[in-house]
C-alpha cells in the first residue's frame, strides 16, 4: 500500500537531503492551501509532484520528498519550469516572479502590491538563510534536549504556512544580529529615570506594581541603587528595548521630556536579555518576569505595538484566575499552566494619553528556579529541519522510544496522546466549561518535557484571550455586564473561526505532520487520537458543546489565509473585519466520524 503521507522513495532520499528549503516550503504550502489552482499529482516516475499551471500550457513542477494529507509538504528543489520545448530550473527569485505574475494562481494584483510582496518574501528568505547559517546552535536544535532559551532562539523558520515567515521590515542586518532570536541575539536593556507623573502602570492579583518592579531589578545592585536614587528625585525607572528607544526618541512628547530632564537615559544596565521567538518578548534566566515590549516592526502580518486596553485586559485575566474555580484548573509545576501577564508600565504624552510605543508588559517566568528545564515552544519542535534530517519532535520521540524500549510507532502515538491531554483537552475544557478562549497557535504553546516526553504545557501570550456568553454567566461579577461593548467578548461564530483555527489547524495539524514526516506512523492515526481525546471531553458532558461539535463533525474548518492576506498587504490587527482573510479547509476529523459509522 502506498501511504497517503509517505516519505517518498526513502532509499533515494539522501540525494535530496539539502534540497528542501523550509522557507520556500512555507511559501509553497501556504499557496497550495489557499489557491485551488495548485495541483498535487502523481508523476510518471511514481513520485508526488507539486504543479503550478501557467499560461500557454506551461507549468512549474516541484517533486515532493514528503506528501502530507494536512498540507505540510517537503520539497525537492529547485523548481522546474516546463515549457513546450524545454525544462529549466528556476531560482527562488524566478519562482516567486512566475507565481505573482500568474492571475490563475493569485488573481489580479496591482504592480505595487506585487513589488511589496516580492520584496518581503525574498527578504524573509534571506533572513531564514542567514539564521540557518549563523545560528549559534545549528544541528543541536534538531537532535538534543533544549532549554527554554535555546528553544526560543532555535525557531529558524517561523510560521509554517506563511509566504514570508521571517519578514521584519525595519530591521537592518546589524539590528537583526543584536535583536533577533534566531541569530542568538542578546543585550542589556536601557533604563530610564522618569518623573513619576509621566508614568502609568497597572498590576493584578492584589500585588502592587512597585513590589513586582522591585523583584525585577533585585538581581543587580546597580539597578537597585538606580531605583533608589530615582525615587529620591520623584522619579521611577522604566525598562526600554534598545531598538525601540530609537523609535521613542522621535516622539514629540518624549523629546520634550528629555529636554527638560523629566526623562534621563541611564544607559544599559542589569541582566542580559534574550529575545524569544516572538522577537519583542525577552527572557533573562533566573528573573521572576519576562518582558513583552512594543516593538514597532512589521513581523509577518502586523505591527507589534502594545496598547493600554490590551495590558489592562491581561491584568483582568490574571485577576479572573484568582477565582478558586479557575485556579483549580491549573497545574502546579506540571500539566496545563499559564504564563500570566500580571503588570505593565508605560509613558504618557503631553496630553496625558499613553504612548503605545513605550509600553512594556511583565510576563510570569515559571522557569525562574529551573532555567534548564526542557520547555520547548511547539513551533521549534515542529519546524522542518534545514540541515537535513528529522524534526526536533521526531528526534525527541526517538529518544523516548529508546529510553522506554518502545517501537517508534508506539512512542509516537503515546507522545501525541500526551500532547492532547496536556494541551488540546485543557484548552477546550476552559472554552467548553468556563467560556475562556485562548488562541493557542504554535508560538503560544510551550511544551514541558521530561526525557523528551510531554508532562505539561505553558500557555503564553494572553493577547488572544476571549470570553463567551458562558464566561459572563459564570464570572459576570468579575467581567462586568457590558459584554457586547468588549473587544474580547466572543460570540459562537468568532469562537469557531479563531479558536479552532489556531489550536487545531495551526498547532495540532502541524505537529501531526512533523511527527509523521519522519516516523513510521500515518497522519490519519494521529488524527484519530485527536478525535478520541476531543470526543471523550464532549461525552463527559460540557456546558457549551458547540465548538467541540463543530471541530468533530463539520466538513470544513475556518482557516486563515496568510498568503493572500500578505499579498494584499493587509495589517491583520487593523482589518475592520478579520473574517475576510479566512476560508474553508476540509476537516479530516469529520472523516474519522464518517469512517466510524460505516
Swiss-Prot record:
Reactions that this protein is recorded to catalyse: N(6)-acetyl-N(6)-hydroxy-L-lysine + citrate + ATP = N(2)-citryl-N(6)-acetyl-N(6)-hydroxy-L-lysine + AMP + diphosphate + H(+)
Q: What is its pathway? A: Siderophore biosynthesis; aerobactin biosynthesis
Keywords, A to Z, come to: ATP-binding, Ligase, Nucleotide-binding, Transferase
| Broadest EC class assigned to this enzyme | ligase
Q: Which Pfam families is this protein grouped with?
A: FhuF (PF06276), IucA_IucC (PF04183)
Might you give the EC number(s) for this enzyme? 6.3.2.38
Q: Mind telling me which Gene3D superfamilies this protein's record contains?
A: 1.10.510.40, 6.10.250.3370
A GO biological process of this protein is: siderophore biosynthetic process
Stored InterPro entries: Aerobactin_biosyn_IucA/IucC_N, IucA/IucC-like_C, LucA/IucC-like
Report if keyword Nucleotide-binding is assigned. Answer: yes
Q: Which family does it belong to?
A: Belongs to the IucA/IucC family.
UniProt function note: Catalyzes the attachment of a first N-acetyl-N-hydroxylysine to a carboxylic group of citric acid to yield N-citryl-N-acetyl-N-hydroxylysine. Involved in the biosynthesis of the siderophore aerobactin which is a chelator that mediates the high-affinity iron transport systems induced under iron-stressed conditions.
Name of protein: N(2)-citryl-N(6)-acetyl-N(6)-hydroxylysine synthase
Organism the protein comes from = Vibrio mimicus
Amino acid at each position: 500500500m502506498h501511504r497517503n503521507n509517505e516519505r517518498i522513495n526513502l532509499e533515494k532520499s539522501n540525494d535530496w537531503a539539502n534540497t528542501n528549503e523550509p522557507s520556500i516550503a512555507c511559501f509553497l504550502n501556504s499557496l497550495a492551501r489557499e489557491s485551488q489552482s495548485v495541483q498535487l499529482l502523481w508523476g510518471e516516475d511514481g513520485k508526488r509532484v507539486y504543479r503550478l499551471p501557467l499560461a500557454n500550457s506551461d507549468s512549474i513542477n516541484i517533486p515532493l520528498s514528503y506528501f502530507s494529507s494536512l498540507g505540510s509538504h517537503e520539497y525537492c528543489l529547485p523548481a522546474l519550469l516546463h515549457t513546450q520545448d524545454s525544462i529549466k530550473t528556476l531560482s527562488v527569485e524566478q519562482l516567486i516572479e512566475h507565481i505573482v505574475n500568474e492571475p490563475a494562481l493569485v488573481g489580479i494584483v496591482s504592480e505595487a502590491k506585487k513589488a511589496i510582496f516580492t520584496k518581503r518574501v525574498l527578504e524573509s528568505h534571506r533572513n531564514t538563510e542567514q539564521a540557518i547559517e549563523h545560528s549559534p546552535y545549528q544541528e543541536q536544535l534538531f537532535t538534543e534536549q533544549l532549554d527554554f532559551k535555546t528553544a526560543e532562539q532555535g525557531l529558524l523558520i517561523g510560521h509554517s504556512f506563511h509566504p514570508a515567515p521571517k519578514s521584519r521590515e525595519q530591521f537592518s542586518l546589524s539590528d537583526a544580529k543584536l535583536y533577533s532570536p534566531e541569530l542568538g541575539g542578546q543585550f542589556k536593556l536601557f533604563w530610564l529615570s522618569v518623573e513619576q507623573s509621566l508614568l502609568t502602570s497597572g498590576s493584578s492579583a492584589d500585588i502592587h506594581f512597585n513590589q513586582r518592579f522591585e523583584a525585577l531589578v533585585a538581581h543587580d545592585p546597580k539597578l537597585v541603587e538606580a531605583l533608589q536614587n530615582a525615587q529620591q528625585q520623584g522619579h521611577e525607572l522604566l525598562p526600554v528595548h534598545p531598538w525601540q528607544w530609537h523609535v521613542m526618541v522621535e516622539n514629540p512628547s518624549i523629546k520634550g521630556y528629555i529636554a527638560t530632564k523629566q526623562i534621563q537615559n541611564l544607559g544599559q544596565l542589569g541582566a542580559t536579555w534574550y529575545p524569544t521567538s516572538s522577537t519583542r518578548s525577552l527572557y533573562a534566566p533566573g528573573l521572576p518576569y519576562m518582558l513583552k515590549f512594543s516593538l514597532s516592526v512589521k513581523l509577518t502580518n502586523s505591527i507589534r505595538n502594545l496598547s493600554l486596553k490590551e495590558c489592562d485586559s491581561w491584568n483582568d485575566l490574571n485577576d479572573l484566575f484568582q477565582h478558586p474555580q479557575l485556579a483549580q484548573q491549573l497545574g502546579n509545576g506540571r500539566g496545563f499552566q499559564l504564563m500570566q501577564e500580571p503588570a505593565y508600565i508605560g509613558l504618557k504624552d503631553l496630553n496625558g494619553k499613553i504612548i503605545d510605543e513605550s509600553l512594556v508588559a511583565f510576563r510570569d517566568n515559571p522557569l525562574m528556579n529551573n532555567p534548564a528545564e526542557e520547555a520547548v515552544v511547539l513551533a521549534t519542535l515542529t519546524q522542518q529541519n534545514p540541515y537535513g534530517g528529522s524534526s526536533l519532535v521526531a528526534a525527541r520521540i526517538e529518544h523516548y522510544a529508546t529510553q522506554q524500549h518502545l517501537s517508534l510507532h508506539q512512542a509516537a502515538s503515546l507522545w501525541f496522546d500526551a500532547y492532547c491531554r496536556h494541551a488540546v483537552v485543557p484548552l477546550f475544557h476552559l472554552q467548553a466549561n468556563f467560556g475562556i478562549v485562548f488562541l493557542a497557535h504554535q508560538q503560544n504553546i510551550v511544551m514541558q518535557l521530561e526525557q523528551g516526553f510531554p508532562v505539561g504545557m505553558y500557555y503564553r501570550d494572553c493577547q488572544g484571550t476571549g470570553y463567551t456568553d458562558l464566561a459572563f454567566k459564570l464570572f459576570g461579577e468579575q467581567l462586568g455586564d457590558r459584554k457586547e461593548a468588549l473587544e474580547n467578548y466572543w460570540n459562537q461564530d468568532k469562537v469557531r473561526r479563531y479558536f479552532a483555527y489556531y489550536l487545531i489547524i495551526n498547532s495540532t495539524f502541524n505537529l501531526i505532520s512533523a511527527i509523521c514526516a519522519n516516523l513510521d506512523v500515518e497522519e490519519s492515526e494521529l488524527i484519530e487520537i485527536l478525535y478520541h481525546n476531543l470526543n471523550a471531553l464532549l461525552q463527559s458532558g460540557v456546558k457549551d458543546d458547540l465548538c467541540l461539535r463543530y471541530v468533530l463533525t463539520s466538513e470544513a474548518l475556518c482557516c486563515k489565509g496568510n498568503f493572500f492576506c500578505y499579498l494584499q498587504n493587509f495589517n491583520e490587527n487593523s482589518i475592520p473585519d478579520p473574517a475576510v482573510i479566512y476560508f474553508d479547509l476540509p476537516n479530516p476529523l469529520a472523516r474519522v466520524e464518517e469512517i466510524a459509522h460505516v
